[in-house]
Amino acid sequence: MGRNPLIIGITGRIASGKDAASKIISNKYGFYEISADKLGHLVLHEKKEELVKIFGQKILNTRNEIDRLLIRNLVFNDNKELKKLESISHPIIFNKIKKILIQNQSTKIIINAALLFKINLEKLCDYIIVVKAKAPIIKNRLSYSMPSIDSNIINKILEIQKDIFFKKNIINLKIINIINNKNYAYLEKEIEKKMQEIINYERFE
């Protein structure tokens, strides 16, 4: 892009450890973190009227606000509804992130996005870190972090996210995999190794 010193994208399925990895990189290596998930929440607020027209009043809570749990359950049970939501939210999220990059051109950036490839954010990145974990481990983590979430919803989320790492015609992009089937200390050590690889590569570029 001819802009920021270094832009790393980080992606992974739900409960893979993606968010923890992003925070480690942000805090330890001085990267400014952009959360696509948080921007997605903002889009729900900004596009409330349009979304209510499409999905109906059933996505609103008692305060007449869009309820993320209600809309999540709706779209994860209907692929057509999911595509409608993505067609509205993804271009806006992409443009918001691009704007943040322009506003922070002297800063190292990490873009934290589960749907990084679906939103086309790989176009903005120098490197992409993919955090992976086995499905049983993901489910076990979710049983602790989100005990109220329905197991059927978990299975549908994992099914939807199974191909989030694959995209044709990715060229000139350095993709780094981290397998996170263990604990936080192990994840930290893996990140240290991978970040050292990036630092060494950048040094000799």
Curated annotation (Swiss-Prot):
<comment type="pathway">
    <text>Cofactor biosynthesis; coenzyme A biosynthesis; CoA from (R)-pantothenate: step 5/5.</text>
</comment>
<dbReference type="GO" id="GO:0015937">
    <property type="term" value="P:coenzyme A biosynthetic process"/>
</dbReference>
<dbReference type="InterPro" id="IPR001977">
    <property type="entry name" value="Depp_CoAkinase"/>
</dbReference>
<keyword id="KW-0808">Transferase</keyword>
<dbReference type="GO" id="GO:0005524">
    <property type="term" value="F:ATP binding"/>
</dbReference>
<keyword id="KW-0547">Nucleotide-binding</keyword>
<dbReference type="InterPro" id="IPR027417">
    <property type="entry name" value="P-loop_NTPase"/>
</dbReference>
<feature type="domain" description="DPCK">
    <location>
        <begin position="7"/>
        <end position="205"/>
    </location>
</feature>
<keyword id="KW-0173">Coenzyme A biosynthesis</keyword>
<keyword id="KW-0963">Cytoplasm</keyword>
<dbReference type="GO" id="GO:0004140">
    <property type="term" value="F:dephospho-CoA kinase activity"/>
</dbReference>
<keyword id="KW-0418">Kinase</keyword>
<dbReference type="Pfam" id="PF01121">
    <property type="entry name" value="CoaE"/>
</dbReference>
<feature type="binding site">
    <location>
        <begin position="15"/>
        <end position="20"/>
    </location>
    <ligand>
        <name>ATP</name>
    </ligand>
</feature>
<keyword id="KW-0067">ATP-binding</keyword>
<dbReference type="GO" id="GO:0005737">
    <property type="term" value="C:cytoplasm"/>
</dbReference>
<comment type="similarity">
    <text>Belongs to the CoaE family.</text>
</comment>
<comment type="function">
    <text>Catalyzes the phosphorylation of the 3'-hydroxyl group of dephosphocoenzyme A to form coenzyme A.</text>
</comment>
<protein>
    <recommendedName>
        <fullName>Dephospho-CoA kinase</fullName>
        <ecNumber>2.7.1.24</ecNumber>
    </recommendedName>
</protein>
